Amino acid sequence: MKKFLDKDFLLSTEAAKELFHKYAEKKPILDYHCHINPEEIAKDRQFENISQLWLGSDHYKWRQMRSCGVEEKYITGNASDSEKFQKWAETLEKAIGNPLYHWSHLELRRYFGYEGVLNGETAKEVWTICNEKLREKSMSARSMIKQSSVTLICTTDDPVDNLEWHKKIKEEESFDVQVLPTWRPDRALNIEKPGFKDYIARFSEVSGVNITSFKTMKEAFRKRLGFFISSGCRTTDHAPEYIMYVPSSDKEVETIFDKRLSGVALSKEEELKYKTAFMLFAGGEYSKNDLVMELHYGCKRNNNTLVFDKLGPDTGHDCIDNFAPGAQLSNFLDALDSAGQLPRTIIYSLNPNDNAVIGTILGCFQDSSALSKIQQGAAWWFNDHKPGITEQLTSLANLGILSNFVGMLTDSRSFLSYTRHEYFRRILCDLIGSWVENGEYPYDVKILSKIVSDISYDNAVRYFKFKL
């Protein structure tokens, strides 16, 4: 029987062990998509206790606590931090097979030096150990980033953000990790949302463009995008329910935009026509400015109306959606490609059933401008576990070129989540090692070491054109 979480955790062959320990493990981390708050980096936040660091905004953990019948006051309510931690520890011991069990114990070992197991009985001991450690300067926000060997972080930012914290981080000479903004204009895309009109007013104010039409909205978009680029932005992100393609004329879109600003409700077809026009315009701008376009879709958000009304979004009430027509995704990419405006694109679906669809679409739009110009994104959110990661890697290998894959990202709000890169690299090396062990690929260490090193770090540096 193997020891829990030993040095060869998830590594089942000699080839896997060699590839991980000699190569993948030694690569630094490039976190090109996350939800870290740049203000906490700029202020070098020192967390008071492990609950603030672990449970403050982690809806992954909140979902499991609710599944164990924990009262909401111990999750997002006014219970003490120590009580919340106790409830989490009692939940964790039941989470066999869940990646949170692995992530949590990896974090305890890598950052706090705790080699034991967290459960209801050990919660007080772990609480004390972690909180004593968190008082040290070596556990401030920046210090945790540095000790994780992170070289670059891309946050997720709205076009109206002033990026003041990114600027302050850049001016800090003692901190050499790049923290770059990511352009995420979802609120300008979501024309059907109740707050759209107010958001456009804010967008108008910040951009200095009087937005009265789709044409002037595009002018404001270009202006703010230019500001983001001047602040180091190299990638963009969109999170629609799915990638739609319902083309229309410029005149139609102007009419739809004017109708919405006038307070008139839109039909579903009008909504889709606007979103298609918006995304085609956005993709063209990204191509002109040599930016990467990331597309995250396949999520149905805020499913529990009662809880949403109390707690708001991002509290653990989202799920996988199974409506994502591959034909519309393909038509969208084709429209951009036909206009000579298809940027480097990473496609993520939250639904694992879309892996093969995405894998076959990728091959239709590759060209010599980049290695795997159109990429399938890493398994994320509800798929960010051993079977989900393995399935995504295997599908990509079956249908494309795994060696060109840009690899892992945390997609997280936590400064401890960099262990997810280790988790991913172990699974990657184990998968490749199994192919070698089974005689499906030669044991050529020179080639294999380059493949795992590239996927772990180097491909992302090249693909996004980061200057490191």
Swiss-Prot record:
Q: Where is the signal peptide?
A: none
An example GO BP is: D-galacturonate catabolic process
- Record GO terms (molecular function): glucuronate isomerase activity
Report the pathway entry.
Carbohydrate metabolism; pentose and glucuronate interconversion
Print the keywords alphabetically: Isomerase
Catalytic activity from the UniProt record: D-glucuronate = D-fructuronate; aldehydo-D-galacturonate = keto-D-tagaturonate
Tell me the superkingdom of the source. Answer: Bacteria
Q: What class of enzyme is it?
A: isomerase
Q: Which InterPro entries match?
A: Metal_Hydrolase, Uronate_isomerase
Instruction: Cite the EC number.
Output: 5.3.1.12
Record-stated family: Belongs to the metallo-dependent hydrolases superfamily. Uronate isomerase family.
The record's NCBIfam families line, in alphabetical order, gives:
PRK02925.1
Q: Which HAMAP family match?
A: UxaC
Q: What is this protein called?
A: Uronate isomerase
Species source reads Endomicrobium trichonymphae
Gene name tied to this protein:
uxaC
